Amino acid sequence: MAQSVSATRRISRLRRHTRLRKKLSGTAERPRLVVHRSARHIHVQLVNDLNGTTVAAASSIEADVRGVPGDKKARSVRVGQLIAERAKAAGIDTVVFDRGGYTYGGRIAALADAARENGLSF
């Protein structure tokens, strides 16, 4: 039985993410910046993989991001700014970028560029 196009794309993304996760791991000094993108929102977390904790998180669901005028890319930029601010507050300046199997472009690239411009290095 043939799969739908959306199922095939989801499975391909999960395979890409699995390949990435074999190579990426976050530590307390350099946590993993994990991105999840849905059709409407974008979520990002700083994860310490050694003890399985989330150091900081930001999402487009938050009230100050929902009020951003513009499209989803503008909201992604604001989420990138927020995660950089929260990382600085937690004493983190370098991260490992985990794009979650998504292609590096559009909202993912906008979030990463905004985080870099606001002080995160990866």
UniProtKB/Swiss-Prot annotation:
Listed Pfam families: Ribosomal_L18p
Key words, A-Z: Ribonucleoprotein, Ribosomal protein, RNA-binding, rRNA-binding
Assigned GO CC terms: cytosolic large ribosomal subunit
SUPFAM superfamilies noted in UniProt: Translational machinery components
GO terms of biological process kind: translation
Domain of life the protein comes from: Bacteria
GO terms for MF: 5S rRNA binding; structural constituent of ribosome
Keyword rRNA-binding: yes
Family indicated by similarity: Belongs to the universal ribosomal protein uL18 family.
Subunit structure, interactors included: Part of the 50S ribosomal subunit; part of the 5S rRNA/L5/L18/L25 subcomplex. Contacts the 5S and 23S rRNAs.
Functional summary from the UniProt entry: This is one of the proteins that bind and probably mediate the attachment of the 5S RNA into the large ribosomal subunit, where it forms part of the central protuberance.
Name of the featured protein: Large ribosomal subunit protein uL18
Upper taxonomic lineage: Bacteria, Bacillati, Actinomycetota, Actinomycetes, Mycobacteriales
